[in-house]
Amino acid sequence: MPKDRTAAGFVLVCEAKGQRLYLLLQNARHGAWGFPKGHSEDDETPMETALRETREETGITDLQVVPGFEISDTYQVHTPKRGEYRKTVTYFLARTPKAAHVQSHEHAASGWFDYTEAREKLAFPALQETLKKAEAALKGEKG
């Protein structure tokens, strides 16, 4: 039985000119949109993984992590190469000062989207729920 895997990433948000935009990446293999994330290496913490993967996939290093936001989702994965295994993905929330253009060899496309557009692009309910919680957390800070 293949070993369970862990991954981590960020819900990245840029707030400029009164608008809140979220970064989404479109997977080049299966076309689904999601947040920057990747698998953990060795003994990395989820935060270390999220920082490394975000830097590798987006080039963005100027992040302000929002304290207290951490969401994990565990689900079954089946691939021809690895077989069936359990994967746990942890997401953190961070701001970045500008909506930088992102190019990644792992992704077919990328973009910064408002909440409604981002929610429509996210195909997986767990990612939609993560986005919803991120939006609520950001609104709560202002209140």
How should each PLM-predicted stretch be described?
Residues 34, 86, 112:
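Short aromatic/basic micro-patch
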Residues 17-19, 29-31, 41, 71-76, ...:
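Short, charged/polar surface micro-motifs in flexible loops or helix N-caps
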Residues 59-99:
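Active-site segment of metal-dependent pyrophosphate-handling enzymes
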Residues 1-21:
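Conserved N-terminal beta-strand and adjoining loop/helix that marks the start
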Residues 18-61:
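Conserved Nudix-box catalytic region and its N-terminal flanking loop in Nudix hydrolases
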Residues 91, 95-132:
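NUDIX/MutT-family hydrolases
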